[in-house]
């Protein structure tokens, strides 16, 4: 049985924090691969302006192209309508029946888990993995983890890694203000952002 991670997000743009999380998940969970899945039309961000999905996909693809154990999927980009996690997990479970899936997400999603569509199905289709994010205390995170585990009778895996205080929002604002982002994003992403004149 293979073990693969699904790392979903808007990746607008992908940054060094995303890569750090993916590497940590890969080795701490002993995964065979980590699949980055840029969201097509995330239901929790319908009121926000998001960069074209194909551009976000290309950013991720270019950044990870030489990483043997990373890949990117355009599954959510090809599907019309809102990008629900249960649909994505169902697709990958049906397509790869020899694989045990680990869904990797942040503390912010853990705090909103009750509002997710078909959350019972989500938790039954994967091992749900949560990493810390800035702005969320360890105490609050562990309380929510325990509450969710009791409510849905499912185990949540806590990925114990240092908090990387980088956000795509901060990066977009820095670009808009003509500030240096070279220490926040991979070189390939930075070059593509400049070439396409993104986030200005």
From Swiss-Prot:
PANTHER family: NICOTINATE-NUCLEOTIDE ADENYLYLTRANSFERASE-RELATED (PTHR39321), PHOSPHOPANTETHEINE ADENYLYLTRANSFERASE (PTHR39321:SF3). Pathway: Cofactor biosynthesis; NAD(+) biosynthesis; deamido-NAD(+) from nicotinate D-ribonucleotide: step 1/1. It catalyses: nicotinate beta-D-ribonucleotide + ATP + H(+) = deamido-NAD(+) + diphosphate. Belongs to the NadD family. GO terms for molecular function: ATP binding; nicotinate-nucleotide adenylyltransferase activity. The lineage of its organism: Bacteria, Bacillati, Bacillota, Clostridia, Eubacteriales. The keyword ATP-binding applies. The gene is nadD. It comes from the Bacteria. One of its GO terms (biological process) is NAD biosynthetic process. It comes from Clostridium novyi (strain NT). Its EC number is 2.7.7.18. Catalyzes the reversible adenylation of nicotinate mononucleotide (NaMN) to nicotinic acid adenine dinucleotide (NaAD). NCBIfam families: cyt_tran_rel, nicotinate (nicotinamide) nucleotide adenylyltransferase, PRK00071.1-3. Disulfide bonds: none annotated. It is an enzyme of class 2 (transferase). Keywords: ATP-binding, NAD, Nucleotide-binding, Nucleotidyltransferase, Pyridine nucleotide biosynthesis, Transferase. This is Probable nicotinate-nucleotide adenylyltransferase.
